[in-house]
């Protein structure tokens, strides 16, 4: 008996969508990757460029697709969005993107898809909440990429400070994927030791009292620096999305800081932001709650307030 194919549909064939498709194809996590775009010829070109590398990849079926691919997809990854036009305000751009994302979300829901919707388009927290509302799905099945990449940047930055492999740094960036995000230092550890304790032995490059504010600033601003250098970010984004997709397709129950609409967790409700979640086949299956210290709880609440205000303004 044939096993069910693990299928991912990518909506939006631009730099982020195509880089994700490329990284996913190399990972071996998916058996089928459909690439869709408003510009069908562009999607065809991206798919053709990828399939010609199939002799170098794990077995995978890559093709250009359309809305009919949603129905049997395990994950639909939405990277589509409008670019800001000259003279267009931030809120007008947000409204245009919300219209695009809600339209896609409705199409996915109406297709009968039983999988997970992963929103990547920015501002990801607001658009994920809009997509959830449009879809009518349960909240764990409509998630955003959130601060998974920000968390990777945080771990990388700390690895330079501590002289330890980034994969052995444990910690999270939480809240908004944006300027109000914060580092959950209370959750940050190396080899089971709190980061402050680990660095107190003088093993970190800045000594026992490293500059936490400077590290957070570096994490927050890293995307801006890359944009200054090359115009946009997509390599690390593609890898972060592949990590999330792998957790879903392989039912890993990994703990990732995806963006999810909260329903009382951390004392917050009706807001979508990044917190540690168990991610498996059905999406974000559970939020991992913890008692945050007062300053981190205040930062989370400030992030939630900012996002709620933006969502209200958009509507």
UniProtKB/Swiss-Prot annotation:
Catalytic activity: (S)-lactate + NAD(+) = pyruvate + NADH + H(+)
Keyword set includes RNA-binding: no
CDD domains, alphabetized: LDH_2
Pathway: Fermentation; pyruvate fermentation to lactate; (S)-lactate from pyruvate: step 1/1
Record-listed E.C. numbers: 1.1.1.27
Subcellular location: Cytoplasm
GO biological process, one term: glycolytic process
Binding locations of beta-D-fructose 1,6-bisphosphate: 155, 170
Binding positions (NAD(+)): 16, 37, 81-82, 120-122, 145
Residue positions, PTM Phosphotyrosine: 224
Pfam families: Ldh_1_C, Ldh_1_N
Taxonomic superkingdom: Bacteria
HAMAP family in the record: Lactate_dehydrog
Similarity comment: family membership: Belongs to the LDH/MDH superfamily. LDH family.
Name the record gives this protein: L-lactate dehydrogenase
Gene name tied to this protein: ldh
């Amino acid at each position: 008996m044939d096993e069910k194919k693990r299928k991912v549909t990518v909506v939006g064939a631009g730099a982020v969508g195509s880089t994700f498709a490329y990284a996913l194809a190399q990972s071996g996590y998916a058996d089928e990757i459909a690439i869709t775009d408003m510009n069908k010829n562009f999607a065809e070109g991206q798919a053709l460029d990828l399939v010609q590398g199939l002799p170098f990849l794990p077995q995978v079926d890559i093709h250009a697709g359309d809305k009919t691919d949603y129905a049997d997809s395990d994950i639909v990854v939405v990277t589509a969005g409008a670019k800001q036009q000259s003279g267009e305000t931030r809120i007008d751009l947000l409204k245009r993107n919300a219209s695009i994302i809600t339209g896609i979300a409705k199409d996915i829901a109406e297709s009968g898809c039983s999988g997970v919707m992963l929103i990547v388009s920015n501002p990801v927290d607001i658009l994920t909440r809009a997509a959830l509302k449009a879809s009518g799905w349960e909240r764990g099945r409509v998630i955003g990429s959130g601060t998974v990449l920000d968390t990777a940047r945080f771990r990388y930055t700390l690895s330079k400070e501590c002289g330890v492999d980034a994969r052995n740094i444990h910690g999270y960036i939480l809240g908004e994927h944006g300027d109000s995000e914060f580092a959950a230092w209370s959750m940050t550890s190396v080899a089971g030791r709190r980061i402050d304790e680990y660095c107190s032995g003088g093993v970190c490059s800045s000594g026992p009292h490293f500059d936490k504010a400077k590290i957070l600033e570096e994490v927050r601003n890293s995307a801006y620096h890359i944009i200054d250098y090359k115009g946009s970010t997509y390599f690390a984004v593609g890898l972060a999305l592949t990590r999330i997709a792998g957790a879903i397709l392989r039912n890993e129950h990994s703990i990732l800081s995806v963006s999810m609409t909260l329903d009382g967790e951390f004392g917050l409700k009706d807001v979508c932001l990044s917190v540690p979640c168990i991610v498996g086949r059905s999406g974000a299956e559970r939020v991992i709650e913890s008692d945050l210290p007062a300053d981190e709880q205040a930062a989370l609440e400030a992030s939630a307030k900012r996002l709620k205000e933006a969502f209200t303004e958009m509507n």
